[in-house]
Amino acid sequence: GMGLSFKKRIKRLQMKEVAGRFKVVTGLKVSDLIDRLKRPKSANFVVIDSVQYLDVRSFDRLKKELFDRFPRKSFVLVSQVYKGRPKGKMADDIRFDCGVKIHTQGFRAYCQGRYADDAEAYFTIWEEGAAKYYLTE
């Protein structure tokens, strides 16, 4: 199920305003996700948090079963990090294949990849948290 921090974030971001257009589904296998995405009016954006919890371990298989099968859908893949790099071979393979990579640190998001004009540019996710993080860094 959803963790407490996620539930608090949904409340803080007033996600009830988009009820019916935003859905959280947990514990799905990739085959279940495929079944959901085959349905009419299924989600156009899918967030997978995190790739380490998928029941598929091969990037080639994930690409074939999800990305190639649903080319009009957008997938946002979240990865755990170990020593500044995506954790595990599949996460590393995803990193090299994807067009846009977003690295987060200290409540700031940095775009890394083909579309980044300025490597130092960032988006502040949470002002108060970022101020505390960078003040004490």
Cite the ranges covered by each PLM segment.
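Conserved alpha-helical scaffold flanking the Walker A/P-loop in AAA+ ATPase domains
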Residues: K29-K41, K64
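Conserved P-loop
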Residues: G1-D32
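Phosphate-binding/switch region of NTP-binding enzymes
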Residues: D68-E137
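Alpha-helical scaffold elements adjacent to nucleotide-binding pockets in ATP/GTP-utilizing enzyme cores
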Residues: S5-R9, R61-E65, D93-D97
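Conserved beta-strand segments of the P-loop GTPase G domain that flank and frequently precede/overlap
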Residues: K23-G27, V47-S50, V76-Q80, T104-Q105
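Conserved ATPase-coupling elements of RecA-like P-loop NTPase cores
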Residues: Q52-K63, P86-G88
